[in-house]
Amino acid sequence: MEEGLVGPRIYSCCKCRNHIALHDDIVSKYFQARTGRAYLFTHAMNVDLGENEERQLMSGLHIVADVKCSDCGEVLGWKYEKAYNETQKYKEGKFVLENFKIVKEGFYEHVSSG
């Protein structure tokens, strides 16, 4: 008999451990942020958004808003508000969180018993 995972797999703020996103909401693990690798999520929680601004990114011009932890104010990434390029429209409304700004919690090894 196999036992499943215990609890949800969550990503938390690196500074204060506030819960920010669920592993199940990852769209892509292959995004590049200012300081390295990042994940694209469909949803984020316990965050505040900065002002919308036009930003030239590797994939073109977008309107984005910085994503900050609602507890400590740490900037964790950004939210895509608008993509001008038709091929980038899938990003609209989604969140990019930088890997070094979030930590995994609740990622347990799958254990077989019996």
For the regions a language model picked out, list residue spans one by one:
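A short Gly-Trp-Pro
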Residues: 1-114
